[in-house]
């Protein structure tokens, strides 16, 4: 049980690091600490390559023909 919790924590931490690695500089608060929160919606929509896929997953369109 303890190992599965540690594995889950390591998986989440590695995914967070990957997100910070591939995020656009305009959308990352670490890359641009002076950026205002209002500037986030104006960021490049192509900055997150997984956004269209997650949108399709949430709407249930992925996998339908």
From Swiss-Prot:
Subcellular location: Secreted
Transmembrane segments: none
Gene Ontology annotations of biological process type: defense response to bacterium; defense response to fungus; innate immune response; killing of cells of another organism
Residues of the propeptide: 24-49
Repeat region (AXPX), residues: 23-26, 27-30, 31-34, 35-38, 39-42, 43-46, 47-50
Tissue: Expressed by the venom gland.
Keyword Signal included in the entry's annotation: yes
Subcellular location, principal: secreted
Secretion signal span: 1-23
Leucine amide modifications at: 62
GO cellular component: extracellular region
This protein's UniProt keywords: Amidation, Antibiotic, Antimicrobial, Fungicide, G-protein coupled receptor impairing toxin, Immunity, Innate immunity, Mast cell degranulation, Repeat, Secreted, Signal, Toxin
GO molecular function annotations of the record: toxin activity
Known role: Antimicrobial peptide. Shows activity against both Gram-positive and -negative bacteria, as well against fungi. Also promotes important mast cell degranulation. Shows little hemolytic activity on rabbit and human erythrocytes. Its mast cell degranulation activity may be related to the activation of G-protein coupled receptors in mast cells as well as interaction with other proteins located in cell endosomal membranes in the mast cells.
Family classification: Belongs to the MCD family. Mastoparan subfamily.
Entry protein name: VESP-VB2
């Amino acid at each position: 049980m303890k190992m599965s919790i540690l594995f889950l924590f390591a998986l989440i931490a590695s995914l967070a690091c990957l997100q910070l690695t591939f995020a656009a500089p305009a959308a990352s608060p670490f890359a641009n600490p002076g950026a205002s929160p209002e500037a986030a919606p104006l960021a490049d929509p192509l900055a997150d390559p997984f956004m269209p896929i997650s949108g399709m997953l949430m709407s249930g369109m992925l996998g339908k023909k």
